[in-house]
Amino acid sequence: MPKLKTRRAAAKRFRVTGSGKFMRRRAFHNHLLDHKSPKRKRYLGTMAVVDERDHDRVSHMLPYAG
């Protein structure tokens, strides 16, 4: 069987934890930040876990990620 190709766009957007979960960045932390509170901006800067319903989709895009 040939090697599977990794979707490069997904490889740049997701990271795998030690337990095999996928982490992603949060939205709304790119621009238009003046009116957002510092607390909200700190929260948006943290990583989030990909929902379990999307786990299979992400794992197909990243065949060698854990």
From Swiss-Prot:
One of its GO terms (cellular component) is cytosolic large ribosomal subunit. The keyword Metal-binding does not apply. It holds the Pfam family Ribosomal_L35p. InterPro entries: Ribosomal_bL35, Ribosomal_bL35-like, Ribosomal_bL35_CS, Ribosomal_bL35_sf. SUPFAM superfamilies: L35p-like. Keywords: Ribonucleoprotein, Ribosomal protein. It comes from the Bacteria. GO terms for biological process: translation. The keyword Ribonucleoprotein applies. GO terms for molecular function: structural constituent of ribosome. Belongs to the bacterial ribosomal protein bL35 family. PANTHER family: 54S RIBOSOMAL PROTEIN BL35M (PTHR33343), LARGE RIBOSOMAL SUBUNIT PROTEIN BL35M (PTHR33343:SF1). This is Large ribosomal subunit protein bL35. It comes from Synechococcus sp. (strain RCC307). The lineage of its organism: Bacteria, Bacillati, Cyanobacteriota, Cyanophyceae, Synechococcales. The gene is rpmI.
